[in-house]
Amino acid sequence: MNHLPEHMENTLTGSQSSHASLRDIHSINPAQLMARIESYEGREKKGISDVRRTFCLFVTFDLLFVTLLWIIELNVNGGIENTLKKEVIHYDYYSSYFDIFLLAVFRFKVLILGYAVCRLRHWWAIALTTAVTSAFLLAKVILSKLFSQGAFGYVLPIISFILAWIETWFLDFKVLPQEAEEENRLLLVQDASERAALIPAGLSDGQFYSPPESEAGSEEEAEEKQESEKPLLEL
């Protein structure tokens, strides 16, 4: 048997799914269409989708988690005050963890500004933060002396690297596709509602209803029948 090429099969599958979604939408009555439109408009009025809000919460968790680990590291290495002076005031690229904390602050500011305040629908902001984070951490791991300072020399760079890439995956595979799908659904529902408004309403059963004969008409027929039978009785 001849098999269709893969791209033709994908095209047929996509067209069938789109036709199925259109049939599903057109099969809904106008009241349900209006309810769906109002629900989508309500989501638009909220300003930010649920999945985007979850992404922003994860970005905040990234900053707080790295900050917590850095504070623990300051306590372990001789007290917060003394270690803070050593890592911030007398900053040394080869032995300080302060730059990893600043890297988390950089990710937080760029991502919250881009995807919560400006509500971007593009991946360039997350690509910037992930590229900067990956390049900086790789350079620091290769050039610095963090591994000689105990467990935190491994933990902080690895955690920062993993969190940055989880944010990238979540935005690219969850936030942007889901919001695009919801927008397409809204357009389909609005188009279906506009077409439904142009289609005349179907004929109801009441338009084909024939009322029963009235009692007045039946009484008149009975009187006429009696009058026609009277001459026959007289004979």
UniProtKB/Swiss-Prot annotation:
Biased composition (Basic and acidic residues): 225-235
Bilayer disposition of the protein: Multi-pass membrane protein
Modified residues (Phosphoserine): S15, S21, S27, S193
One GO MF term: cholesterol binding
Sequence similarity: Belongs to the STARD3 family.
Subunit composition and interactions: Homodimer. Interacts (via the MENTAL domain) with STARD3NL. Interacts (via FFAT motif) with VAPA. Interacts (via FFAT motif) with VAPB. Interacts (via FFAT motif) with MOSPD2 (via MSP domain).
Protein name: STARD3 N-terminal-like protein
Gene designation: Stard3nl
